[in-house]
Amino acid sequence: VKTLKDAGFKKLIVTAKHHDGFCIWDSKYTDYDVKESGYKDKNGESDILAEISKACTDQNMDMGLYLSPWDIHEPSYGYKDENGQPTTPENDKKDYNEFYNNQLEEILGNPKYGNNGKFVEVWMDGAKGSGANAQEYNFQKWFDTIQKYEGKGVDGRDADCMLFGAEAYTTVRWIGNELGIAGKDTWSKSKVDKNANTINSNKQGNATVGFEDGNQWTVPEADAR
């Protein structure tokens, strides 16, 4: 983190859980985490997210949280009956939305995570894998949880937590590629429909260029791999 700070970086977004479902903190909601891997730091703790958070706090580096909604490992993902077979939402035996919300609470509600206990952005991604599209996300519940801990006015915060990949609630949008390339002319607004929970950021070629007359401010964020 010090190297990033010295290089001029202002924020670090840490991948606490990617699509594979593996958690880099000791989550009480799954055994697919860093503790079960046998990893321990010099103090005998199994919590990489806490280690990174401490480093960001020491360097006063803003933190963002990447917590993938798509979870290949979690049995409650999708709609399944008591035998684990695909079913309809009303017959679903385990609520994945509650599982994900519990993990949000577990991280955002714990002061040892984040820069001095704070996250300025939650990166939710937008991916759903093959066979997983039936899972509908309860975005409103999740966003209420995020802003409860990270919203404007909470412990002196002067702005709401930024949201990436949050459909119509997005305030930080994907630029449209993983090449670090943005359009020459890019507007910082998208067109969203809260009722349909959709967002249109005007994809042209390999980049989203936004709209001059959009109805929601969505900061375009470029990433490269």
Describe each model-derived feature in a short phrase.
Residues 1-225:
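Mature catalytic domains of secreted/periplasmic carbohydrate-active enzymes
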